[in-house]
Regions:
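The feature marks non-catalytic terminal segments
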Residues: 109-122
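Core structural elements
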Residues: 119-133
Length: 180
């Protein structure tokens, strides 16, 4: 309902326009929550670590690449990028270059399980490029702690069988036991 228009310049300076901030929930609440303490604790990345990304557990590399692309490329994105690629007279086809880039990213991740590999891909590439930008709104006002970014949590996730991570089972069970 227009809450961002008064803050659009401030938000663009915070996130450098690297993400879509026209519907940023963070901007709607930052002024209210920043007065409740000096440290904000974020649950960001819990959804990635404690759930199945939805890829077939037996997906081959080609299907993993296709899966990643469907998660990243927005509607109309291929068309726009392909037209710009052609307009700029770049070699090859955009679709092929993008697929090859993601294939190489996935090959760099030395994990055989497709579900874990996609989770690692998102943690390595997605968080840095998209998810972290939204946090800049919070860190502009307060110090922030993100427990799911800790090495200990990531190492723990690597030891948990997928059946407990899927559908956030382990997370939900923990909440039930600690906050009945």
């Amino acid at each position: 309902n227009g809450y961002l228009w008064e803050k659009i310049n401030e938000i663009s300076l915070m996130n450098n326009c690297l993400i879509d901030f026209t519907h940023s929930r963070q901007a709607a609440v930052i002024d209210q929550i920043s007065y409740h303490g000096d440290l904000l604790i974020s649950g960001q990345w819990g959804d990635v670590l404690f759930d199945n990304p939805g890829i077939n557990p037996s997906a081959n590399l080609e299907n993993q690449v296709k899966f990643i692309i469907t998660k990243i490329v927005k509607p109309g994105g291929y068309e726009l990028a392909s037209k710009l690629w052609s307009h700029w007279d770049m070699e090859g086809r955009f679709e092929n270059e993008l697929s090859e880039k993601f294939k190489n990213y996935l090959l760099d991740i030395q994990i055989s399980n497709p579900i874990s590999k996609v989770r690692a891909f998102k943690s390595i590439h997605w968080a840095n490029r998209w998810a972290n930008e939204g946090l800049k709104i919070f860190t502009s006002r307060n110090e922030m702690f993100i427990p799911y970014y800790s090495d200990e949590i990531c190492e723990f996730i690597c030891t948990v069988p997928e059946k407990y991570l899927a559908d956030r089972k382990i997370q939900i069970e923990y909440i039930k036991r600690k906050s009945p």
